[in-house]
Regions:
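Structured-RNA-binding interfaces characteristic of tRNA pseudouridine synthases
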Residues: 1-204
Length: 204
């Protein structure tokens, strides 16, 4: 976000703030992130796109720029969010994927993880899975789907919902990994949700 604001401020010669559809925790990479910004004057979208991609770092790319109504807000208008968490299960760590997946280095009981995940789908108070103990706002969220896919050397957990708390996906994933390691019972998710304390969930 800071890099985008820096380049836009340089282009417009004004202090610019953007609103993203969602924040990303440390170590999280955004794909197809939507952001909105109010500019004082009318700019050609193609000119903005070209300028930003010319001056942004190589690991950030703006795919498209479109004019929207004055009322549009990327975060408030977001219909849903999707997180994909990759877990490496092969013994040897991949040097090419080290920034994009968590290396566990062991096989997991995926069927047990899927059973546990079913109890997390729906509208619940996810306070147990919130990384911010001082959270004052509601910790109720809706997860519409959790898909767990297994390939030869990787497990991918895809969470879809209306929004996620700070570190919620990491904590959910850490908990499901413990289920896959048989360190936690697959049927324990309802009890965990009722606990309302972070210390009872998995490590991250």
């Amino acid at each position: 976000q800071g890099k985008l604001e820096q380049v836009l401020s340089r282009m417009t010669e004004k202090e610019i703030e953007i609103d993203g559809a969602g924040r990303t925790d440390a170590g999280v990479h955004a794909k197809n992130q939507t952001a909105s910004v109010h500019l004082a004057k009318k700019w050609d979208p193609k000119e903005i796109l070209q300028y930003m991609n010319q001056y942004l770092p190589e690991d950030i790319c703006v795919k498209s720029v479109e004019p929207v109504s004055e009322r549009f807000h990327a975060r408030l208008w977001a219909e849903g969010k999707c997180y994909s968490y990759r877990i490496g299960t092969d013994e040897q760590k991949s040097v090419f994927d080290r920034k994009f997946r968590y290396h566990l280095g062991e096989a997991l009981d995926v069927e047990a993880m899927r059973r546990a995940a079913q109890d997390l789908v729906g509208t619940h108070d996810f306070k147990t899975f919130c990384g911010n103990p001082k959270m004052k706002k509601s910790t109720v969220r809706t997860i519409t789907d959790i898909v767990i896919e297994e390939s030869e050397h990787e497990i991918r957990i895809v969470y879809t919902g209306n929004g996620f708390l700070q570190y919620m996906v990491r904590i959910l994933t850490g908990t499901l990994i413990e289920v896959g390691q048989h360190r936690r019972d697959a049927d324990s998710m309802p009890e965990l949700l009722e606990r309302m304390e972070r210390k009872f969930a998995g490590v991250t």
